[in-house]
């Protein structure tokens, strides 16, 4: 099974368990918090991700951690499952996939907008309203910065890519010029 399918399977399983009790948002908050703890704490991350550390030791540590938390039992069991199956390294990917499922269940499309510089709130609102109008759907916009695009924006959602960047335009011009034959 490839990594993307594996991630999707774990995310779907977690989401389906959350749906039983109608606590999808709560589970997302909790799994995101756990992921943040692991990302922010070098010692915990190294311990959980290390192939050298005995799996039983990892399970014992996670068991003691989850007993002292107020996280939902679904989250605790899910974390233990990841440890038992040596899948803690893909937790961040699972959280992202779960987030996508959560938005899809609310009929909200996740859209990534990349700009060369940080956009002002008014610019972000304008872009969001234009995208929602074009898609005829509510959106969750993730604004990212990539100075290599020089200017303009790139919009990504699903398998679509709309490149309105200066770099993209220059790349198209370069490609077109390479095809031109100059007669001597």
Swiss-Prot record:
Record bears the keyword Transport: yes
SUPFAM superfamilies tied to this protein: N-terminal domain of the delta subunit of the F1F0-ATP synthase
Pfam family, one: OSCP
A single Gene Ontology CC term: proton-transporting ATP synthase complex
Residues spanning the membrane: none
Membrane topology per record: Peripheral membrane protein
Assembly and oligomerization: F-type ATPases have 2 components, F(1) - the catalytic core - and F(0) - the membrane proton channel. F(1) has five subunits: alpha(3), beta(3), gamma(1), delta(1), epsilon(1). F(0) has three main subunits: a(1), b(2) and c(10-14). The alpha and beta chains form an alternating ring which encloses part of the gamma chain. F(1) is attached to F(0) by a central stalk formed by the gamma and epsilon chains, while a peripheral stalk is formed by the delta and b chains.
Protein name in UniProt: ATP synthase subunit delta
Source species of the chain: Rickettsia felis (strain ATCC VR-1525 / URRWXCal2) (Rickettsia azadi)
Gene name tied to this protein: atpH
């Amino acid at each position: 099974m490839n990594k993307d399918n594996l991630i999707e399977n774990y995310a779907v399983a977690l989401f389906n368990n959350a749906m039983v009790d109608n606590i999808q948002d709560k589970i997302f908050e909790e799994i995101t918090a756990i992921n943040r703890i692991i990302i922010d704490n070098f010692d915990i991350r190294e311990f959980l991700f290390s192939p050298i550390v005995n799996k039983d030791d990892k399970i014992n540590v996670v068991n003691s951690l989850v007993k002292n938390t107020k996280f939902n039992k679904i989250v605790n069991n899910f974390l233990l499952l990841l440890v038992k199956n040596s899948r803690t390294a893909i937790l961040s990917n699972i959280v992202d996939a779960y987030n996508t499922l959560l938005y899809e269940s609310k009929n909200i499309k996740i859209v990534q907008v990349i700009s060369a510089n940080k956009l002002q709130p008014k610019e972000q609102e304008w872009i969001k309203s234009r995208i929602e109008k074009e898609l005829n759907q509510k959106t969750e916009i993730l604004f990212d910065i990539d100075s290599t695009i020089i200017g303009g924006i790139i919009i990504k959602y699903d398998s679509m890519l709309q490149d309105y960047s200066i770099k993209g335009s220059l790349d198209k011009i370069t490609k077109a010029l390479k095809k031109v034959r100059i007669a001597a």
